[in-house]
Amino acid sequence: MTERNPILQSLFDRKSVRVYEEKPIPAEMKQAILEAAAQAPSAGCQQLYTILDITDPALKEALAESCDHQPFIAKAPLVLVFCADCKKWYDAYLEAGCTPRTPGVGDLMLAVTDAAIAAQNAVVAAESFGIGSCYIGDIMENCDTQRSLLHLPDYVFPAVMLVFGWPTQQQKDRVKPQRCAMEHIVHENGYRTMDGAELRDTFGYKAGNAPFDQWCTAFCNRKYNSDFSKAVSYTHLRAHETLANL
């Protein structure tokens, strides 16, 4: 493979950072990160998201608790919540005298996608400054609590939360978790269901020296069947129902 250019190298090097130096992010860097997020592609160039810049220390503490009791969230110098926003265009249509339909599941999916793409733009921009980041999936758990904390109206859903900060040396030195081999990620011209042997080959590296079945069962219980996973799945269903029924 040819030598990677700086952008590619940054993408390959990027890993989640959860421990930060006690150093603020300069205002001009923060602004650049936010502006980069807004340059992300979006469905129909609608930018179906709203970014919440969390600066209130008390609110950071509350989010750290509501997002599975993770204190490092409150210590991060920059905390952003990317909301899937189906409200502002709906309100604009009403303002213009239109008779818009009620936002539905498809609108939510587009808005969540827009929010996630914008969030990743912010991550890449931060990496260019040497600023680390971590996605907080727990923002979708306890949705009623999060919506109350963030004063979210109908048709607005907390899709993505990101925390940013200057990584400590220990975080810089930490080995990035391995990714699956490309032949298991890329399918040509259509989806191909993998057989048991391929699945074991795909995820076997994660098991290390443990028997695959033993590792996979433990991982399933800890992740897929966990209370958090069930809560997030329930939250997604409720978000769809809320948009469909309001």
Task: Name these PLM-found stretches.
Residues S42-A43:
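Glycine-rich phosphate/pyrophosphate-binding beta-alpha loops
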Residues Q46-A116:
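Glycine/small-residue-rich phosphate/adenosyl-binding loop
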